[in-house]
Amino acid sequence: MKSKPYLILFTLLVMAACQPKIELEPVDIGAAEVAVTSILDNYHAAMIAGNANDCISFLGNNGLYCGTDPIEIWDKETFSNAITEAMADTSFSINYAIDKRIIRIAGDGKTALALEQFTMNAISEKIPIRLISHLMKTDENWTIDFISWSLIPLNEDIPKLNKALE
């Protein structure tokens, strides 16, 4: 009777030892960062150029896209429509340059998180924007499957903003 637990334990150990070892392919994080940087640069170039179709081409089909307003939480189709509508207005012009960009590539090289900060004249010349993006690699292509645009006032300016909103 006492040998039964040992037999079960031995069987489990043998089964675990006989499992094939999965060899992970080494990931070139540097190359992935270059690819993600290129996607982001091209996305922003399309935004500045007012090319809605190019902007949309970088978006993942099952993505989540958030604007600066709390009600702006969109799927790809709704976000694409908003981009297309905004860029159809030829008087609408945006211009900005990325002031700060931080990219983190996941250890498996298949996802990335990007933080970008800039000031965009079309939204506010005084309050910077922080754009958080998540990118996913499928096959050899990277797509943006999450975007969150946020206004990021300086902490010292928050009381002024609160006063202005009274």
Task: Please annotate each region the language model reported.
Residues 18-53, 57, 163-166:
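Short, low-complexity N-terminal intrinsically disordered segments enriched in polar/charged residues
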Residues 59, 69, 107-109, 116-119, ...:
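A mature extracytoplasmic/lumenal domain signature
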Residues 64-74, 87-92:
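A short gly/proline-enriched turn/hairpin at secondary-structure junctions
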Residues 80-124:
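Surface-exposed, charged secondary-structure patches
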